[in-house]
Amino acid sequence: MILTMLRAAAAITASLWLGTGLALADTPKKGGTLNFGVVAEPPNYDCHGSTTFALVHPIAPHYSLLVKFDGKEYPKVIPDLAESWTVAPDKMSYTFKLRSGVKFHDGSPLTSEDVKASYDRIISPPEGVVSIRKAYYADLVVETPDPTTVVFKLKNPMAGVMEALASPFNCIYSAAKLKQNPLYPQTEIMGSGAFTFVGHVKGSTWEGKRFDGYYNKERPYLDGYKIFFVKSAAVVPGILGGQFDAEFRGRNPQEKGQLLDKAKDNLEVFEGTWVNNLMLVFNTTRKPFDDVKVRQALSMAIDRWGGSEALSKISILKFVGGVMRPGYSMSLPEAELVKLPGFSKDINKSREDAKKMLEAAGAKDLKFKLLNRNIAEPYTPGGIYSIDQWRRIGVTAEHEQLETKLYQDRVAKGDFDVAVEFQADFMDDPTAQFSKFLTKALSPSGYSGHTDKKIDDLYLKQRRTADVAERTEIVREMERYALTQAYNVPLLWWQRIIVNHKKIKGWHMTPSHYLWQDLTEVWLDQ
């Protein structure tokens, strides 16, 4: 049932093609190097501790997953290391049969022990290892009856198991290397994916080349790929100037127009909804952000509905929504959403109420620093817009923008007042989407520092509820409560616009920029 729901949500996404006409099915060609831009660098190389595209886009081609999402038919789950699987009638056990003869890039064999070691690292990370999604997989126990069989047993019922196992962040590492050093994935690339690691020149490039020992002898088509790390403003000149042919995260409407004005006949455009929102995180360990009225007031000052109309013309920010993607089957209906703090369409009344709430809380003329990434889209416009909205209720915020690693270090340490953060994962499922709204006891990405166990309890309850209608009610209760407490508040959801050179084939856009980035099916028509 969860798969059916996700497919219904994905159906909203539309792909548009602009150029000389849609090509019929082409015969893939081997060879060539795919050059593409990435607008941020990974803070380290560890998939299990990451939430950023800056890691997925360079690193996904180097690793295999147990199973993965099909970019052509999202959210269908297809084999990767697992060639087949069976599900017990009570859905409390999932058994996977691994491909034979799979090798890591160093020539060592990949067996069920490597899958188990990787998932054990996610579920129960050793000291010093960060596992962002450990709460997601807490009910799983991994067993290995033989070298080609992996069994996941559930302690409790769990919704969306196959989709959870298809996470692009669940890279399979070498058990032998993890035993020597559980932290090795942070600084070393050694996977079993279609491309081996060539090199990373910080601030400049990343390169991978075809792995001749890849389990699928017909893949990859490419000889290799090369990434250029650039500022967001350099993507359009980079594509027009021929430095690279693609950027897989997304461009804003103005940039799409610039590209089409200059090179329409050579470009392919994809557009659709995005499983991403920009949100504000209030550090509840610092005053006055420990006061719910202060947090609510700062959310209520922001005109999301007016901002949607204005910002969607110049940025990738567009849709008004709560914790769940607007239009998704489990999200709060708009009629309910507008009753919650920060989502009313009467912005004048909201701002007057917000001023009174701040004064009552002793926070009149509040001043603080807004911590943000130095990535133009959509962080800069989102930060600037929020600061302008707060100014209208007498609040002054200083915009502090940092390089991604420095930003993430500060947020992880709780060294901020308010932060511009994102909520994004590889699918719509609430178990994924609520990860940053939890306490740190349950999720390392609970950056607000709140200790509200009610959210954690509701989270666990929905995760263990198989009945869709019952689960939807729990999710909506959790969403109402989270938005009212306002530890984190969504600003706007994103629109995804991809503009690539039309010679790139085999790449398909999904609602998540984390998916379909292993490049195994990509080829160049040249």
Language-model-detected regions and their locations in the chain:
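Extracytoplasmic/peripheral linker and loop segments enriched in polar/acidic and small residues
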Residues: I347, T396-Y407, A432-K502, Q526
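Ligand/substrate-recognition segments at binding pockets and active sites
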Residues: K202-G203, P253, I347, R351-F426, ...
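Structural transition elements
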Residues: K318-A360, E377-Y379
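Ligand-site clamp/hinge motif
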Residues: G213-Q258, Q296, I387-D388, T396-E398
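Surface-exposed binding/hinge segments that line
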Residues: K97, S131-K177
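Gly/Pro-rich hinge or "lid" segments in bacterial periplasmic/extracellular proteins
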Residues: K68-K72, A166-P220, G224, A233-A234, ...
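Long beta-strand-rich cores associated with HINT superfamily self-processing modules
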Residues: I498-Q526
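N-terminal lobe/hinge region of extracytoplasmic solute-binding protein
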Residues: G37-P89, D120, E188-S192
